[in-house]
Each structure stands twice: as structure tokens, then as C-alpha cells.
């Protein structure tokens, strides 16, 4: 025994793998008995320490990964980008789903890796961490769901739910996440109950197919083997694959033999291989054993129980079946915890080693599209790629069929992904149909890419010929499903609501529309019939016994009212302008009154200077339309812009010095540079000419005029010129050329020579359309609009002083309301409308215009009492039927499809909500700041009484930037009715207020109303709520944006052009909504709103071009292939699919492709005969290895280690049958018959004409039913059929396997004492004695395909030939 001082002490954690290595080392060096005695001691120690430690799992042990927060945010950011590209029409719905799956699966995998790293750093002895690597009931996947994220789930149909579960069980799931998680949990519970029996049945089938495999020989003499392609970066995998194997050939290093053939590989041998060689190592395998019915000792290798060569006579087949089937039962118990969770593989990427420019030959690549919709290039063959950096060049080789994600000559950064490598084995795929549904009513349209002719008559199914966009253009269809002919109107006719459209042939169904509310008005004095008005009209009539007055309320839904502190602004969606509301006189506007102002941010000054007018024209005030506001009259009468043009600012820098002139360090008319000291404390921040002047308060002011001093050659002629503005491109003194506008100023000092000072000038351009009109109600017969008037705030030649840190506006824009007097009276009422829903509320401006219809002049001054109730209700009828005619519910323009020739044509009504008007003017951005001071008035816009309070605030507000407005919908407006009101006719207008159930509401009230009205709100549950009345804060919501001068070269979309979302016109800042241009005006565009859908090649369109579409209709069916998604319940269905070799399995596909590839390669080198033979043999070997790797991959994903040799025994039995072809001898076997490979080899050795056969891959069930023993087949399944066929054929069971001997009660042919084993050993000893007396050479590695004899020294006698033929004939006769 060694001295204690010489003992080696290892202070490290012993995990399961390390303990297994110690056990193997002990058994190798000391034997099983000593190793058992040593291992009893750590076992006892382990139980003692586990009892003392009492390791248990608590909720505090569940530690969340710190990196989860930013990983989730990054994934959500990528999801938002995918959603934007999908809305733009750049992605298919399938590509969007793929991006989402790839993003969240990658996030989940990174989170899982971070979880293991976090446990290993912070708390390695954490019970949760130890459980994940214990190999018992827990694994990394289960722990990841406890502390990481549950991830994507699969529904019962196997479809992936596109809403990932971001939470884990430690944090708790939300309601939505819990419902989604129940899909997988329910699937897990079902699998726990059902898959347990499947696991047991799988074990039975595995044992059934290999039960006769017994070790009978020491060496079969084969020279074949399999190659172990190893990567020394994963030493653990190399140890598991090589230890216990036997070498198939010698291993050489530099002509030195490192290991001999038939030498078993132990730990020391593997260490030599890892340190000295990197070549693939060929080892013997059960799948390449030459034994016909059994297996040899060297092809199997070590026994896993004692670390030595397996004993002859051991039933390794049953051991292999049990070792593969038994883990399936254990894995089934994990189903409940992880059921339904989606798993996949991250694609293998190529990253750049350093920064540089990519260079490759572009002739070998062609453009394509990735599965996520990104542009890429695919290479035909292996592509040589070079990265040219600053100091060195890196060369990379990209495999064939890989996707390049970068362009040629593109600059890349270090570790950037440049290529995606295609997997060698094609993964299993399935064909999926994804349906795209419409989310709005309208009309379907497409241009190219779709087959317009259907395959069948009267069919609306159209396939796509290539990738194209399918548009859904917004519109309202009263003629649902094209059931009625449009007989009264033609295309482009304008109609009003309640207009008869067509004759009714039958009473159509009344579809429900949950979002449509109607208003019923009752008048008990005139008529008992209810009159229904939809809120699309927004025009309501109050009936009484003597007259009728119509009150038209215009709600500016393109704008909303934004409140900043105490000030209200108008905000528009498609231009970045805010307008300050300026409404006076109790909220009453007269014709041509202004109601909102803003200062254009483009025309703001940040530096002092002199203003010079250019081509711009200024007019005087319009005396006929003078405003009643003195403030408005003051600046309107002097500087109103009549015609657009340009004006200029000549900048200058001003400094105010002390009262003493001597304190100024520079003299007058002297040129200074930047940094020159003007006074002792002031330095010049610009270069130019110094001008000193005296102010009124006896202080001296210093101005720096930027420019260059030039002394001309002829000062007399120059003095005749006055100061002028010189445009770009003009020459000065025939020496200089101007690059920009300059202000040429002449300076004449008192005592010095006169000189010229060219000063830079800043040009401002304003559009010629200084006054424009926008009609508020498109497609309505109302001559109502707003004018935009621009005003200059400074006169020509005025010096503008800008205080540091502030901006001075140059132009102010006013919005002026105007209408035709033939329709309305002289007044319009403005009120604030607040529309409140459950989770949101918005403010709008409402303008009430009062006009009269057949009103007697004598009764206009009388009091009119009208009693009516407005009730909110929901109607199911989408259109009204009157006298068998279809009545329109909408007001707009008829759009009739021209794709159908019959009388039943699709019709769409374009209403105001379906269209949008976009100005061609150029917008700009300058949103209001957070520090804006606001104001409001509790009075009815009586600003005259509040000027003293808010004067200073308003001055600051007017110096702010302009603001933008946002388009909103008026679909959520609710109405109230007045039970008893008493008003003057000339001031009569109805009331609309914002609503909120069971709350006190603020009601707008006009001061000219004689009696406060009583308001009642009726909600959707017919509940009546009384609301109190208060004074109204009346605001004007007339929405418009401030125009700016247009630029030359602006590209306007053509008529009929389709615009995608956020389409930006050239050189403008306007982003247009998606839709189609249906009208082009000189000042604006009319766009019909729509939504694009991208359809790939082969997709199916479910409607005709121009056909009407309802919300929820199926539009497109996308057909695509996707990888089969698995879950981590236990991998049992995947293993069963592989072992049964179903047609959906990728192994059969790989065998066929491998055979073709090897056949073509071999024919070029060897010839046809050898090429077919070797390609069939090698393709079968490759198929066997692929199948072994796929089965091993499923079990490794669950942390289960299975020896490859056991899987190879199963795969050998699956590939041991061959299918006879028609070229065979008919007397021996019929075409299509399954025969064993050993039987075919024996027949070909003795027959003159060989049998032609093809390799085939059988499942374990079919392989079990095609053995030589009918007793074994009958005991497995289909007993009656198997026994009946065996009796008819006269088959004889030779009892070669273990199962049939157990059934008949005989001794099983296994074990060291078996007679067959003893006879086989005796025969081997005789062969060894004979071979020792003769020289023998094994020949080359590639054996002769025509040499089928296993023994070379004895020629078969005639009796042996007859026995073999008799046995073969009898076996074939039984199979017929």
C-alpha cells in the first residue's frame, strides 16, 4: 500500500459522468469484485450526506435569469418590426409567423443558456440546478419553464399558437397565458395516460425483432466498418462513441502504427487518438458484421457491465431492445410537466472573423428569399469567399446550397452573420394551408400575378402565378352577395341615404352588425311611425306640427382636441401642426371669422437680422370682411400675404456695451475674426464688419455684419449702385460667382475709402397658394370650408432682434371658416364634443350650422315646443326593404365592378369614412414642448374678459411651434335627446355630449337658451340616466394643417396608383395612408383607403377582381411547407416513427438520394456494374448511420444515454431484408418477395445466374413478421393469418431463435453452456489450427463483390450444394 504522502487528492465535484468514468477505470484495472467493494463506500457516504443535508426544493430556490427582461424586449421589438413589414405588404402571413417562431424560440434558447450560467455562477449547489442535471425526473427543459419562460405552445391540432407565454411558473401566468398553457397541459395529461402503454408496446416490438441475435463467434472476418467523424472540441462524446469498440483497421501516425486491427479501444487508446490524430477512425459495428444469423464478439465490442469483450453466447439482442425501450416508459412520466411546448433547432450560421469587405464571384449566386422574407442569395456550388480587412485577408468556404445574407463588396463587422448553412439531412416537412381573412368591408382588387380565368365555370377561385399583392379597398356594400341588380343607378353616380338602389327579387337575410347604432325619433303629435337615421349622416331632423328646421352638425373627425394644461389645441394626423383655438363671442362664429392660429416652425428665427421682401406681395385688409376682433385687424390690415414668393433675412450679430465708448476695444468699420474681444468681457462669435451705433438711451450698440470686405477697382461706378439682393450664379465684378443669395451692401466711411460688403442672405419661400379652401364634408352637398390666410409679422427692412435662447416667428397662419349664404344663416355654433368609451376618450370640435326648410317668415320669432326622445338601440337589419326595393343606408358614390357582364354586378358605396383628402403641400415637424403654458376658460369663450390674466401666457404660446393633427373615426358617437326644450328658432340647434354610464355628465349649454334642457342618456341595456347641465367650454375643432411652399420636382402619385402604408412623396414630409388614388386635384389628392395582402406563388384567391368583400370573409389561402414541429413530451412518437420507417420519415428519402449520388460518382470512376453495386452498398450504410443518429438525437434531447451499438443492432435487423426484382430466377423466388441478405448470398454462391435484389428499409413490426420462424410471428400478432399461411405453404420452423424455443419448452440457444455455442467454439479452434499452417492475406479493404465464400480453404462438395438448395427451396416454397 502506498504511503499517505504519495496519495493524490482531488478536490472537485463528482457528477454522474465522472462517477461512471471512475467505475469503468476500477473495473478495467481491478476487476468487478474489487470495483464493487470500492463503490459500496461512496454509496453509503452518499446516503449519509443526503440524510444530513436534507436537500429539498423550495420556492426560494427558483431564481429568475437577470437577462430575461432585455431578451423579452428585444423579441417584442423584432415582433413589432415584422408586424410593420406585414402591414406594408412586404411579408406573407406565413413569413411573419416564421419570424415570430424563430424569434421567440431563439429567445427561449438564449434564456435557457443564461439560466444554466446563472445557476453555475451564483449558486452551483442550488437544488433546482442539481435536479436539472441529475438525470432522474428533471431536465433542463422543465427547469427552464419554472424560472425562464414557457415559450411557444402547440394547439391540439399541432398548429403553433403565435402568442408566446413570456412568464414562467415562478412568476405566475396571466389569464391569456394560462388558457394557452392549458392546451399543452391537457395534451400532457392525455399522453401520460396513453403513451405509457405505447412505450411498453414499443419495448415488446424491439425485443421481438432482435430476440434471436446472440454472440456465436469470436470474429466474423469482416474488413468493413463505420467511420467515426470526431470533433476534439467535444471529448465527452468521443469517449462515449469509441470506448468499448474494436478497430476495423490499423491506425497510423506518420508511418507509425498506433493501434492494430481487432484491438479493443480503452481509455488510454482514446487519449492517444485525441492527442495525436485527427483522421476519422474506422471501427467494427454490429451493422457491418458478416455473420449471417448471429453476431460476432469483435463486432459487438465490450459488454457494458464489465468493461471487457462480450462473452460468446450472450443474448445481446434482448439487451439492446430493453435498453432502447425502457427509457420510453420513464420519459412518458415527464409528459405532464412539459406537454405541448414547441421545440426546434436554431439554424447553423457562418460569422465573420473580423471587419472587412466581402468579396466573392457573383456569377455563382442567384437571388432568392429566406423563409423569413428577407433578401438573400443562394450559391449553386461551394463558394470561395474572401474578407479583405485593413491588415490581413481571411478566406472562407461556404458549402453548396447555402444562403448568403450579404451582397458582394459589402462591408461587414466582426461576428456578423453572413450565411446560413443548409442541413445535410432534409428534415421532415408537412404541407400547411393558412387562411387570410378580411378585417374590413370593401372591394377586392389586384393588377397582375393572378390568373383571371378560373378553372371551373362560375368559380371564384383564382391561383396566383407569381408573388403579387391583393388589395382590399374600403367601401360599404348594401347589395350583399350580389343578389340584386343595380337597375336605378350607374357607375360613379352620387346618391343620398335612404335612396332606392335596386329592385328586390327576394328578401335577403339580415346579417348582424354589432357596431352599428341607430337613432329613433318619436313625435306623438304628427306621426306614430318611427323614423330611423343612421349616424353616418350626422344630420337629424326635429319634427313639429307647424314647421321643420334642419340642424346639420359637422364633427371634424380628422382632428382631435388636445389639452395642454389649460389650453386647447387642434391636432391633425397626417401633418405635424398644432393650432391654438381662438373662438370668441360665446362660441358663435360668423362667416369669414378666424377660429385657430399657429406659428409656422419653418419660419422661425434663431438669430437677429434685417428682413427684406423679395417676390412676395403684401396686400391691405379686406374692408368687407373686417374682423370684429381688434387684435386680428391690427396685423391683418398691414402684412397679409396676397401672393406667394420669397423673402430674405440678412443675419447680423448684436452686442450691447456700456455707456462709455472707450470700453469698446474695436473701432468702427473694422473687420474682425471669431474670438476677437469686443469688450473686456465680450468676445465675437462670428467674423465680419464692426458697426458701432448709438442708441436712444445713450448706450452704444456693436453689430457684427457677416461678410467679406471688397475694394473695387472703380469706386465711382460702384457708388452708383444701391444695396441689392443678388441671386445665385451671378457674377460680381467679372471676378466672382455667387453660390447662394447674397445681400450686396455699399459702405461709405467718413474718412476711409468706400468699399463693398457682400453679406449672406437666408431665403424663405412660401407657396403661391397662400389662401386655400378645404371642404369639410367630402361628397356632401354642403358649401362649407375653411380658408388658410398667412400673415407676415414684420415689415420690409425691419430689424428683428432675437433674444438668446428664444425663437421669433415670421409668419402666422389663421384658419377662417366660410360657407355659402344660400344654405345657412349668418351664425354657426361651436362646441366641444367628448366621446368616451370604456378605455379611451377623445375630444372633438363640433360645428352646428342652422338652416331652414319651408319655414314661414311670420313664425320665425315664435316659440316652438318640440317633444321627442332619442333612444340608442341596435338594429339587425343592414338595409331597409320598402315595396320590394333595396334602399341605401349610406351616402356617397356608387362604384360598380366591371368584371361581370350579367345584370348581377357587385356594387360598392364610397362613403366619407372610406376616403381621405391629402394635401400636396409639404408638411414639417416641430411638436409642442412639454413646458408649454396653456389656459382655458370656464366661460363660453369670452376671451375679452380674460385677456389680462392670460396675456403673457398667450404670447408665449404663440411663439411655440406648430402642431400636427390625427385622423380619428366617428363611429363611437352616442346621442342624447331633450325631453322639453324652449329655444329661439334662429338659435336652435341640437345637443351632442360625451357619455359615460352611471356618471354625471357635463352638458353643453348656450346662453341664448331660455330654459335649461333636461338630458337623458339611454345605454345599450336600455338604462336611463339623468344628467345635470352645466355651462359649456366651447371650442372649435375645425381641423387643417398649415401649408408650406411646395418644392419643384415633387412627384405626385398617378391616378389609380396603389399606395402602401407610410408612402412618402418625393422631397416632402407627408406619409400617406395605404389605399388607391381615385382623384387628383390641383391642391390635394383623394385616396380610397385600403389594405394590401402579399400572396406568394401558388396561393389561392377566393374572390373575383372587383368583387365585394365582407369583414371576416376568406381572402387568400397560402400553401407552404413547414418543418414538422415536435414537443418535448418524451420523443416517443418520434422514435416510433423512425423505428417503423414510415413513408413520412426522411430516412427513406435520404436512402434514395444517397443511392443516386453514389451511383453517379462511382460510374465515373469504376464503371456501371461496380458503380451500382458499391452505390447500393454504401447508400445502405449511410442510411443506417443516419437512422442511428436520428434515434440517438431524440433520446439525447431528454438526457438519456443509449449506446450506439444497441441502436445499430436494431437498425441491422431493419435493413436485413432485400426485395427481389423481376430479373431473378422464377423457380427460386418470385418478384417482390422479401428474402434475407444471408439467404441471398448463399444462393448467389452456388447458382450460375445471380439473383438481382434491391435494398429496402422495413419497420420493426414488418421485420418481426417476415422472419423464418412462423411460431415467433404468430405469437406476436395476426396469429390466425400467420398460422394459416404457414400451414398452406408447409413451412418448417427450425427453432433458431430464443422466443420460439421458449414457446415449445426447449432450451434456449444462448449462454456459455449452449450446444451450438460449444460447437461454434470447436469449429473456430479447428480453423485457427488450419490457418496457422498456411499463409493467408486479407487483401484490400474493398472486398471482391463476386467472392461470396466465407471460407477460402474448402471447396463445397455436391452434398453441401444439394443441402443448401433443398433448404432454400423449402423456405421459398413456404413463402409462396
UniProtKB/Swiss-Prot annotation:
It is found in: Plastid. Its cofactor is Zn(2+). It comes from the Eukaryota. Gene3D superfamilies: 1.10.132.30, 1.10.150.390, 1.10.1790.20, RNA polymerase Rpb1, domain 3 (1.10.274.100). GO terms for molecular function: DNA binding; DNA-directed RNA polymerase activity; metal ion binding. The keyword Metal-binding applies. It catalyses: RNA(n) + a ribonucleoside 5'-triphosphate = RNA(n+1) + diphosphate. CDD domains: RNAP_beta'_C (cd02655). Its EC number is 2.7.7.6. Zn(2+) binds at residues 220, 289, 296, 299. One of its GO terms (biological process) is DNA-templated transcription. Keywords: DNA-directed RNA polymerase, Metal-binding, Nucleotidyltransferase, Plastid, Transcription, Transferase, Zinc. Pfam families: RNA_pol_Rpb1_4 (PF05000), RNA_pol_Rpb1_5 (PF04998). Its main location: plastid. Binds 1 Zn(2+) ion per subunit. GO terms for cellular component: DNA-directed RNA polymerase complex; mitochondrion; plastid. In plastids the minimal PEP RNA polymerase catalytic core is composed of four subunits: alpha, beta, beta', and beta''. When a (nuclear-encoded) sigma factor is associated with the core the holoenzyme is formed, which can initiate transcription. Belongs to the RNA polymerase beta' chain family. RpoC2 subfamily. DNA-dependent RNA polymerase catalyzes the transcription of DNA into RNA using the four ribonucleoside triphosphates as substrates. This is DNA-directed RNA polymerase subunit beta''. It comes from Aneura mirabilis.
